[in-house]
């Protein structure tokens, strides 16, 4: 077949006539999408990447426009085994909880209105009470992520002055969040002390001057340094700060509201235990080990929390009613004896290998023998990580479905799963494709079985 030329391209009007009855979108928006796709295809034609007849080209364009005009944020099956997957929105939500929140958020809500007094309220009040009770703090504040929490606190307390941090705690997490960069953007000056592997109390003491505004203690939650190491206990830093009248702040990263050891997970010190050291402020994430929406949680002394809330940056970083509602629902789940069932992240992280094996067998039982043979499907033991830099040393037991297809490339199989009517994202290792069951929701097992059958 001869190569497609630019003359073979249909007009916007022609494509519009073909699809206007299939898509209930405004013509102006459809024209925008059609033009966007036509521009892409012009480039592909010039590169000689398309060989289609005019009619085939029209069908091809219509298919692309239909895909582009469909909702882009869709429900997927997470077959990576990573429960707190950043690319998939970190902590997953319980459908029942979402429905409850949706009902409460319909129409108007008392976000900043006190129903008892009939006067203006504070959107932070309810969250503040929940967090203070769970964390043992005087007060609390919520902003849109932990990076925002750290930046707001440093800007308010240390703008124009120095922030003392151990060199061993100058962390970087995904998305290029670096402590030195956050300090700089907050308007403060980094004063790093000690070395990468060893920092002593005297290093902090020698660095204190009349320029010092804050001592920052950062939890290296996404990596561990072993061997010839030393770090200063938080209690010593708090005492040092108190002696010199310098506030001490903790960036606790992932954060956990309970003892992970009790759930047979790695030892992650609960936030409440850290607060027993009496730091002035502590920040952590709401969408990692806590299992809530994207948010940055700030707890600590009432004096400092109130000061942060009066900073103009708070207005820029504050959360909306949807985040507040979801976070409240998440925190409320910790008051229940069945919190591991209500909190989807904790539920999946603690699901035993035995249960996952049973789910995997159900999926295999659904498949025809020929399908299992053609795709080379086996149920195998696996190990996964929590994700998002949480519990970095903990390898969590799991089960996975492995695929070694006879007549299909691994990349084709992976693409077929991703782009199917039920999107499934797994991972490839060597010449094998895997769908790990750790992060597959219980209600998705039948859908996953159908997705395998359809691939």
Stretch-by-stretch model annotation:
Residues 1-68:
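Long amphipathic alpha-helical segments
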Residues 9-10, 77-81, 290-293, 396, ...:
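Short Gly/Ser/Thr- and Asp/Glu-enriched loop/turn motifs at secondary-structure junctions
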Residues 39, 79-80, 90-116:
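Glycine-rich phosphate-binding segment of PLP-dependent enzymes
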Residues 68-79, 108-118, 139-140:
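Short, flexible active-site-proximal loops enriched in glycine and acidic residues
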Residues 72-73, 284, 422-427:
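A short linear hydrophobic-aromatic micro-motif
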Residues 118-334, 451:
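Conserved PLP-enzyme active-site core in the AAT-like
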Residues 323-324, 328-387:
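Conserved PLP-dependent catalytic core of the aminotransferase class-I/II
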Residues 358-441:
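Conserved C-terminal alpha-helix-loop-beta "cap" of PLP-dependent enzymes
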């Amino acid at each position: 077949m001869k190569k497609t030329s630019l003359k073979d391209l249909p007009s916007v009007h022609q494509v519009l006539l073909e699809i206007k009855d299939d898509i209930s979108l405004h013509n102006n928006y459809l024209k925008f999408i059609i033009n966007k796709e036509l521009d892409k295809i012009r480039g592909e034609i010039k590169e000689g990447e398309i060989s289609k007849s005019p009619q085939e080209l029209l069908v091809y364009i219509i298919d692309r426009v239909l895909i582009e005009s469909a909702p882009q944020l869709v429900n997927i099956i997470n077959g990576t085994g990573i429960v707190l997957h950043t690319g998939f929105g970190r902590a997953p939500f319980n459908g029942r909880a979402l429905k409850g929140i949706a009902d409460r958020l319909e129409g108007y809500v008392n976000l900043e209105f006190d129903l008892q007094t009939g006067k203006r309220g504070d959107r932070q009040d309810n969250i503040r009470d929940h967090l203070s009770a769970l964390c043992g703090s005087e007060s609390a504040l919520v902003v849109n992520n932990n990076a925002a929490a750290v930046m707001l606190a440093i800007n308010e307390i240390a703008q124009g002055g120095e922030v003392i941090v151990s060199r061993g705690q100058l962390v970087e997490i995904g998305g290029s969040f670096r402590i030195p960069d956050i300090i700089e953007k907050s308007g403060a000056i980094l004063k790093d002390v000690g070395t990468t592997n060893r920092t002593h109390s005297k290093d902090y003491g020698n660095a204190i001057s009349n320029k010092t505004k804050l001592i920052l203690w950062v939890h290296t939650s996404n990596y561990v340094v072993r061997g010839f190491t030393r770090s200063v206990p938080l209690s010593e830093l708090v005492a040092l700060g108190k002696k010199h009248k310098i506030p001490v702040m903790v960036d606790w990263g992932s954060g956990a509201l309970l003892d992970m050891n009790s759930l047979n997970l790695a030892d992650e010190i609960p936030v409440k235990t850290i607060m027993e050291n009496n730091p002035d402020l502590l920040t952590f994430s709401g969408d990692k080990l806590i299992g809530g929406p994207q948010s940055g949680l700030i707890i600590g002394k009432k004096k400092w929390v109130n000061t942060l809330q009066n900073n103009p940056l708070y207005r820029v970083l504050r959360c909306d009613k949807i985040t507040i509602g979801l976070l409240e629902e998440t925190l409320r789940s910790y008051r229940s004896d069945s919190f591991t069932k209500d909190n989807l992240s904790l539920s999946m992280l603690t699901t035993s290998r035995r249960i996952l094996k049973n789910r995997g067998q159900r999926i295999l039982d659904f498949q025809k023998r020929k399908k299992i043979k053609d795709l080379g499907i086996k149920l195998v033991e696996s190990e996964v990580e929590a994700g998002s830099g949480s519990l970095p040393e903990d390898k969590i037991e799991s089960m996975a479905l492995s695929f070694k297809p006879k007549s299909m490339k691994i990349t084709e199989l992976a693409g077929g799963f991703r782009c199917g009517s039920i999107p499934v994202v797994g991972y490839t290792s060597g010449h094998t494709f895997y769908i790990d069951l750790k992060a597959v929701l219980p209600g998705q097992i039948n859908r996953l079985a159908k997705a395998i059958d359809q691939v």
